Amino acid sequence: MSSSTSAAPVVTIGRVKFGNDLPISIIAGPCQLESRQHALEVASALKEIAARLNIGLVYKTSFDKANRTSASAARGLGLAQSLPIFAEIRSSLGLPVLTDVHEATQCAEVAQAVDILQIPAFLCRQTDLLLAAAATGKVVNVKKGQFLAPWDMANVVTKITSANNPNVLVTERGASFGYNTLVSDMRALPILARTTGAPVIFDATHSVQQPGGKGTSSGGEREFVPVLARAAVAVGVAGVFIETHPDPDSAPSDGPNMVPLREFEGLIRRLMAFDALAKNPR
């Protein structure tokens, strides 16, 4: 893993590169880890798509959705069951793996099984969590809080780099806009790149989430995922984060904003075309 200190930093995980001036790479997978079989099936399908399209892929999923709307909502398989599955995906499929951490005490253990530690948006200012993630030496992907201006993320990134870890990604996932609503300000993408000096990821699926919008769960408008993803790629980003599932409507979490797996390849093809035009204008 490496990160340059030039105006166009690059974070590398194996053969996957994230750079604001490079062709986009993709972070994709289901919202939460549902079972070993489900994870391997989705990861295998995504790997095949990435190979056909010749695009960098990081597999993502969560062992614990710690901020569910309802106390009774499914949260995932938990740390003990999930880490061996993460390790198997890395070893058997050769895919880099991303998962989120919620407590500083989780970071060292989780880092043994994954390539990227993700800091959830609601926790992006938690200094102890950021420092613990940075101390692992792994790539740290920090989601911008829905309550922050893009330039506020400069302080967040500095907390990580102050621990001698330059391997940072920052992810835009929308800003709070009234009750149960997020809005994506595309100006945030170049501002994040300029003020943080990090590769910028656009989270196309959580940006269409309606937090708490269904009473005991969050709603979403997945029909707008392609629209926002195309807009972000046209502006210019290092990568796109897309949650996908074979049957989103039966998923235990974030179903309303996940992309059906059968639609994933077509979406990525279109995004690659927009990306090529944005970064190689004629």
From Swiss-Prot:
GO terms for molecular function: 3-deoxy-8-phosphooctulonate synthase activity. One of its GO terms (cellular component) is cytosol. It is an enzyme of class 2 (transferase). Pathway: Carbohydrate biosynthesis; 3-deoxy-D-manno-octulosonate biosynthesis; 3-deoxy-D-manno-octulosonate from D-ribulose 5-phosphate: step 2/3; Bacterial outer membrane biogenesis; lipopolysaccharide biosynthesis. Signal peptide: none annotated. InterPro entries: Aldolase_TIM, DAHP1/KDSA, KDO8P_synthase. Its EC number is 2.5.1.55. Keywords: Cytoplasm, Lipopolysaccharide biosynthesis, Transferase. It is found in: Cytoplasm. It catalyses: D-arabinose 5-phosphate + phosphoenolpyruvate + H2O = 3-deoxy-alpha-D-manno-2-octulosonate-8-phosphate + phosphate. GO terms for biological process: keto-3-deoxy-D-manno-octulosonic acid biosynthetic process. Its main location: cytoplasm. Belongs to the KdsA family. This is 2-dehydro-3-deoxyphosphooctonate aldolase.
